[in-house]
Structures are given as C-alpha cells and as structure tokens.
Amino acid sequence: MTAIAPVITIDGPSGAGKGTLCKAMAEALQWHLLDSGAIYRVLALAALHHHVDLASEDALVPLASHLDVRFVSTDGNLEVILEGEDVSGEIRTQEVANAASQVAAFPRVREALLRRQRAFREAPGLIADGRDMGTVVFPDAPVKIFLDASSEERAHRRMLQLQENGFSVNFERLLAEIKERDDRDRNRAVAPLVPAADALVLDSTRLSIEQVIEKALQYARQKLALA
C-alpha cells in the first residue's frame, strides 16, 4: 500500500505572514504548495477565459473539478500557473475578485474545489496555506500550524506594504477593517477561523519572519522525523 503524502497545514488570519512562511517552507523542504486563498480567483479566471456562465452552477462544477492549476515558489516569489500560463497578476484584478465572489456562493462549486484542493496532496509532501486547512481540508495532516499576530501588528504590516506600493493609508481605518474581518471569520457558522485542536499556535507579533520560519521548520522536522 502506497503511503499517503504528508501535509503541513498553515492556517491563520490575514496579515499574520502565512504566505511568506509557506513559500519558505515549500522551498526548504522541496514540497508542493497550495495557496487555497487563490483557488476561487483561479476558478473565476478560468471561467472568464472559457466564457463559462458565472451564474451557472452546473457549468462551473466540472470546471472546478478539473481545474488545471499549480503553485510554484521560486526565490520567495509565488507563481500561480493556470493551464500552463502564469496568471499571478491577472487573478488580482477587480474583475476576477468580483467573479470569485460569485462562484464561491455555489455549494457544489465549493465541494468540487474542496476535492480539487485535496488532490494537491502528492509526494514528497504538501504545504497548505489557508484558513481551514487543518480543520476542514486536511484534518488528518501530521503537522498543523496556526500562525497568528495581534490585529495592531497585522495592520502595521499591511500599512507598510501599501505604502511601499505608493498608496496613502490610514492606520486606524486599516485596523478597524482587520478587526471586523477577524470577527466575521472567527464567528462564522461554517468553518470558522480557529486553530485545530492539535495545531501549534505560533504568535508572530514579536518575531521576525526569519524566526517564524526557523521555529516552524524545526517543529515540522521534529514531528515528521525529517533530517
């Protein structure tokens, strides 16, 4: 019997540093990477490319079931590959964001994408980045990490990120938006944002990204008995 490939799940709120951590771990371990947050955008873009009706659940389900998508991390940069083409920039447009909201509303589409995400589990292993990876998508994962940080620290990081890209931002407004999203995510009826019972909760508020990566890799290697 073939052994099931191991999964390391990295869950947590927006701005905690999940993306950076997952890319670093995927590169360090040479494992596959799943960015679950991009999945709905990728499906929406595929639907737009193939002129699939965004209001038709029946048309979207087969597209979701056979979505040809890969995530490749190179030198800390994540490439989203749809049908052999790098669409990392294209999935960030407002048109795609709006379409993603539409397709995510269909229960059968969500079920199809859940199965599609689980299909990323291949040897030698998978790093799964999301919000319910350890609780819903891969509840049997041998290594689960919940990466958190204070809302103030996450707002500060987001502000610096936006300023570096030339945007003028208001810290108090950013903080209010993050707190509102946290409340919505942590208290929703379906798949609330909570650590899995067997997850390592890692607070990155006062840690550098290098320290976070070091702690996470050390924990994963111990759990998986990796060299």
Swiss-Prot record:
GO terms under biological process: nucleobase-containing small molecule interconversion; pyrimidine nucleotide metabolic process
Reaction equation(s) it catalyzes: CMP + ATP = CDP + ADP; dCMP + ATP = dCDP + ADP
EC id: 2.7.4.25
Any GO molecular function: CMP kinase activity
Gene3D superfamilies: P-loop containing nucleotide triphosphate hydrolases
Gene Ontology cellular-component annotations: cytosol
Binding-site list for ATP: 12-20
Cellular location(s): Cytoplasm
Pfam family, one: Cytidylate_kin
Keyword list, A-Z: ATP-binding, Cytoplasm, Kinase, Nucleotide-binding, Transferase
PANTHER family noted in UniProt: CYTIDYLATE KINASE, CYTIDYLATE KINASE/PANTOATE-BETA-ALANINE LIGASE
Family, per entry: Belongs to the cytidylate kinase family. Type 1 subfamily.
Protein's UniProt name: Cytidylate kinase
